[in-house]
Amino acid sequence: MTKEFHHVTVLLHETIDMLDVKPDGIYVDATLGGAGHSEYLLSKLSEKGHLYAFDQDQNAIDNAQKRLAPYIEKGMVTFIKDNFRHLQARLREAGVQEIDGICYDLGVSSPQLDQRERGFSYKKDAPLDMRMNQDASLTAYEVVNHYDYHDLVRIFFKYGEDKFSKQIARKIEQAREVKPIETTTELAEIIKSAKPAKELKKKGHPAKQIFQAIRIEVNDELGAADESIQQAMDMLALDGRISVITFHSLEDRLTKQLFKEASTVEVPKGLPFIPDDLKPKMELVARKPILPSAEELEANNRSHSAKLRVARKIHK
């Protein structure tokens, strides 16, 4: 049975309006989720335009088929159930050589967080899972119970940026020697027990960063985003645009770096002109990230950490 997707879209108008949508264009929503961005983008297209929507979660696609039904009936939407790291290959299979714009809403979606059984939330007791793609083999249970101490420390530092990574990894190691760690609540309590009392008084849940780290590892989120964004920039037509929403510093740092590399050029000083093959292929549409308005922040608590970066294709 399909579970309803209740998802408040973040930076809805900013993300799509910044794409400067052409009514007859070909567009991609790389992270379908609750289909809010897709629905608004489709409202700007004529019947000659087309949207390709990616999601590896069948539940998201099932719900989007209801929400976007009027556009589906007009033949304006193609759903692709796959990880967006396969963006270029899947679009080529569909006969698409270039696109006019693409948007990303990175990270875990609200419905995935809210569905207890998915095991993403440290606030709800559930089996350790955290897979965005339910067909994938690696789960949070595998990471927590089978990764050795050094690998746990590595992912906690790298993806969670938690200064107590070593202490937490050691506590996990000790706990699983007694019995496997099976639920989100068990893990959250172990993490909590590894932190000093003064840390527990700080704002925010003590398990937040570690849960983020495990989720990123399970889904290879940063690796997939890196590959996909580069493919997207390659596939953009001239004047095509890419919008990327991020929710934590690791995603934002990655996006900023990819855009910087694509929009700058390293040439010797005094060179009279820049050869075509060295010209930057992108330019930043906004120098600084676009943040949610005060109204949105008040209406949607989950928008607080959101940042939007936008770039435009200027050279093939």
UniProtKB/Swiss-Prot annotation:
CC annotations in GO: cytoplasm
SUPFAM superfamilies, per database record: Putative methyltransferase TM0872, insert domain, S-adenosyl-L-methionine-dependent methyltransferases
Transmembrane segments: none
Binding residues annotated for S-adenosyl-L-methionine, in chain numbering: 35-37, 55, 84, 105, 112
Subcellular location: Cytoplasm
Intrachain disulfide bonds: none
GO molecular function annotation: rRNA (cytosine-N4-)-methyltransferase activity
Keywords annotated in UniProt: Cytoplasm, Methyltransferase, rRNA processing, S-adenosyl-L-methionine, Transferase
Documented EC number(s): 2.1.1.199
Top-tier EC class: transferase
Catalytic reaction annotation: cytidine(1402) in 16S rRNA + S-adenosyl-L-methionine = N(4)-methylcytidine(1402) in 16S rRNA + S-adenosyl-L-homocysteine + H(+)
Domain of life from the UniProt record: Bacteria
GO biological process: rRNA base methylation
Classification via InterPro entries: RsmH, SAM-dep_MeTrfase_MraW_recog, SAM-dependent_MTases_sf
Keyword Cell membrane: no
HAMAP family linked to this entry: 16SrRNA_methyltr_H
Assigned protein family: Belongs to the methyltransferase superfamily. RsmH family.
Protein task: Specifically methylates the N4 position of cytidine in position 1402 (C1402) of 16S rRNA.
Protein name as catalogued: Ribosomal RNA small subunit methyltransferase H
UniProt source species: Streptococcus pneumoniae (strain Taiwan19F-14)
